UniProtKB/Swiss-Prot annotation:
Necessary for the splicing of pre-mRNA. Binds to the polypyrimidine tract of introns early during spliceosome assembly. This is Splicing factor U2AF 50 kDa subunit. It is found in: Nucleus. It comes from the Eukaryota. Residues 11-21, 29-40 have a biased composition (Basic residues). One of its GO terms (cellular component) is precatalytic spliceosome.
Amino acid sequence: MGYDDRERDRERRRHRSRSRDRHRERSRDRRHHRNSRRKPSLYWDVPPPGFEHITPMQYKAMQASGQIPASVVPDTPQTAVPVVGSTITRQARRLYVGNIPFGVTEEEMMEFFNQQMHLVGLAQAAGSPVLACQINLDKNFAFLEFRSIDETTQAMAFDGINLKGQSLKIRRPHDYQPMPGITDTPAIKPAVVSSGVISTVVPDSPHKIFIGGLPNYLNDDQVKELLLSFGKLRAFNLVKDAATGLSKGYAFCEYVDLSITDQSIAGLNGMQLGDKKLIVQRASVGAKNAQNAANTTQSVMLQVPGLSNVVTSGPPTEVLCLLNMVTPDELRDEEEYEDILEDIKEECTKYGVVRSVEIPRPIEGVEVPGCGKVFVEFNSVLDCQKAQQALTGRKFSDRVVVTSYFDPDKYHRREF
């Protein structure tokens, strides 16, 4: 074998060796690629610090709208509930709180809201949802700054909450701009409702009630007292003149129990208050059954001390329903219940023969129909009419009594 032949053999061996090396390298690359696919990507769709709570699509929408500069990634520490960039999303993490108590401090405001957020389950993590508070003592309002956008939105559910005897008004700041893809409405939790918070914002819905024809001198508490005689309120707003602060004579409300809507409309529409007659109906135009509720024949009348006593039209019955007289708590005590029952019977017998009296009492863990109402059955319709004229507007336990005629058949079936 000549030199040239040996050289060609060596060249072929080197080529085969390089081919095997390249093949092994490609195999290792493929194995490495397959293994790497099992790990989550460190680069795709990873939100910048401070924006972990939103999806990539929401982040892109915010960039497109100019709310996040395309090249800016805020350098903020990551926490369980991220604190988003202060300049970029600060307006979405702030709430205006009006009608604050005189002399309340910023520390007290923060402590109160932090406690409430954890108490009703609106806090998303341990620690303080409220980071800062600024109070304007001259104008009686404050601004709260929260650690996350979502907790800020949820805190709006506290609109109307009571702090030191003051009903707080919670709103978005004037410079607030809704963020694309992020909900702007708080999810009302049962714990918030059961805490007795009555929001001052009544959202548009088929169950929103309009109450017109109110005497201008009636204040929030007096109007609420009338409405609460039918059930718990979710939201209430007495519309006032911005310059004078006086009532414009109309209000809006919504009940916690939506089934009360028709009942309250039936009971309040046409009620005479002094020289005015209430107009009560669903606020939504074209709502189903709104006209039927307005045309109901159930009769209700109210007499406030100092106002003339005018009976509304409608067929009376021999059963009288008394509202706004007792509370479920008062009825739980056996001795107090017996005293109330005896007082009512004794007073009602002054106007006629009383056949029976029913006062539904609360039962633990059971929703008792008509709990808090008093039903009195008279021997005749005439006796019932006399009792209604005498008892309506009277004070019982410092509450103004509201009366209405009740269907005798429902009474005997105990459909309260």
